[in-house]
Amino acid sequence: MESLVYIFVFVVALGVLFFAIAFREPPRIGK
């Protein structure tokens, strides 16, 4: 079960970094 916790934390960290970059720079995704 601990592996699921590490994967969840890793995914959350990637999500935070992705949204930080997406909102910091002009949106270029989907254009």
UniProtKB/Swiss-Prot annotation:
Main location: membrane
Example GO BP: photosynthesis
Family of the protein in this entry: Belongs to the PsbT family.
The protein, known as: Photosystem II reaction center protein T
Compartment annotation: Cellular thylakoid membrane
Keyword tags: Membrane, Photosynthesis, Photosystem II, Thylakoid, Transmembrane, Transmembrane helix
Signal peptide (residue range): none
Lineage: Bacteria, Bacillati, Cyanobacteriota, Cyanophyceae, Synechococcales
HAMAP family per the UniProt record, alphabetical: PSII_PsbT
Record's GO cellular component terms: photosystem II reaction center; plasma membrane-derived thylakoid membrane
